[in-house]
């Protein structure tokens, strides 16, 4: 059972603004978590979401275990992501 990855409009725009090499790393990491996301992501403190670390970048997401969806909310450099 694999999860479907859905990008928010904001996350898709943020991904497209990154360098091609970084885009590839993030997409490769997202493909890896489709089978068992809990093994790769960290729960955010005080927030219902999760984060995935990809080098200096963070991917903020929400995981719907019933519908098997991973909603990518935000993608940004670690110094800007939590602002």
Which residue ranges define each predicted feature?
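A short, surface-exposed loop/turn module that caps and links secondary-structure elements
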Residues: 28-53
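Juxtamembrane/interface motifs at transmembrane-helix termini
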Residues: 45-46, 61-63
């Amino acid at each position: 059972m694999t999860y479907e990855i859905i990008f928010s409009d904001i996350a898709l725009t943020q991904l497209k603004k990154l360098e091609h090499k970084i885009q590839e790393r993030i997409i490769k990491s997202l493909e890896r978590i489709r089978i068992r996301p809990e093994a790769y992501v960290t729960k955010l403190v005080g927030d219902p979401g999760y984060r995935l670390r990809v080098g200096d970048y963070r991917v903020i997401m929400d995981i719907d275990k019933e519908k098997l969806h991973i909603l990518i909310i935000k993608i940004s450099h670690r110094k800007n992501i939590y602002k």
